[in-house]
Amino acid sequence: MQTTRIAMEDASFPYRLGTDCAEDVVARLAALEASSYLVVADTTVAELYGAALTAHIDKEAGPSHLLTHEVGEVHKTLATVSALAEQALGRGADRRSVVVALGGGVTGNIAGLMASLLFRGIRLVHVPTTVVAMLDSVLSLKQAVNTTFGKNLAGTFYQPVEVLADTAALRTLPPREIRSGMGEVVKNALAIRPAMLDRLAGALRPDTRYDDETMRWIIAESLAAKADVTSGDKHERRSGLVLEYGHTAGHAIEHASRGAVAHGAGVAVGMTLAAEVSRRLGHADAGLVALHRELVAAAGVEPAVPDHVDTALVKNWLAYDNKRGYLDSPPGHTPMVLLSAPGEVLHTGTMPLVPVPLALLEEVVDESAARGGAGGGAAEPAAARTGPVPDGPEAAVPATPGPVPAGPAAAAPLPSGPAPTAPAAAGPVP
């Protein structure tokens, strides 16, 4: 496996990338000499890879336990984390255990948050199986779950001991999830590494047929892009905020779509909206907007808000974006990452954010939705999935943000798998 050292201020960990390298993955896990390996996966990934991986770990590394959760963003909640932690403790987890996050961004966040909380922190290894996870989410120290107010609002910062990525896992992904990953790749090129735009434009495939060499190049460029903005900002609160490009509207579209729009596809559409907002504010020209739409379309995502997504819900979620508070924005404004040209991020003081009137952003959302028409925008049927967990929502979210008694945390069932075997009163309270 090819190793890249990911360095963010005082945080550092190896990212190991290969193809058809399952034996190397297990060898790296064995080198950690854990008392047990807590493999966290959703039910789809568990069926595809869970039994084989845990059997290999049992043989070569030590005892392993497969802890599963239901598929989808709607299950990325504190309730799921708590249920998995109870299972882990019931199966004998201790301070020398290692949490292995096997799956996409949803699983990575759930497992990462659990690792940060068990015994106030045990070792975490990411084994990503989606494009978004390989080139984006596992490169962040942010481990967060959703609340009824929005995405990723409850969490911690926690560092993995390493990332072990085998691109062979991408072969089982449906086109929807490949396109989702390419949305994040386009973001990296437009906002951080414009030098990769020419090659990327020729490499993008709407049919999602990427060879291993191209995929490894895409992942390597994304690692470099992330390093460009996080090497001095491990918590992504200053220069690292550039990684939020397209996410203000993208998260709102994703959340409001109730599973029809995957995360990266939402970000892709969100970037086209951000480019149009920048143009209307006088910061960018029509050429930048056209470039955004061309690249998003080349990635296989229609560059418009899908016509079946309720724009009223999208506009509702815009007001709850997780970048609130970074700027002292006037009333009726929300902070956004905007570009004036590829790689040219607008700043307010030292912050790569600009306060944008919500009324303007809402107008751009409405116009994009009207343009989406019968084409369906960024949506694809979630039922088309044949591979690992997608990185976007897969089930209903609350119709409007706010404390709803029957919100995701209340509705999410306990993860599948045996209940804790230890008596409720056994052992000291952690």
UniProtKB/Swiss-Prot annotation:
Textual note on the cofactor: Binds 1 Co(2+) ion per subunit.
Ligand binding (Co(2+)): E184, H247, H263
Pathway involvement of the protein, from the record: Metabolic intermediate biosynthesis; 2-deoxystreptamine biosynthesis; 2-deoxystreptamine from D-glucose 6-phosphate: step 1/4; Antibiotic biosynthesis; neomycin biosynthesis
Catalytic reaction annotation: D-glucose 6-phosphate = 2-deoxy-L-scyllo-inosose + phosphate
Family note: Belongs to the sugar phosphate cyclases superfamily. DOI synthase family.
Function (record text): Catalyzes the intramolecular carbocycle formation from D-glucose-6-phosphate to 2-deoxy-scyllo-inosose (DOI).
Record's protein name: 2-deoxy-scyllo-inosose synthase
Organism: Streptomyces fradiae (Streptomyces roseoflavus)
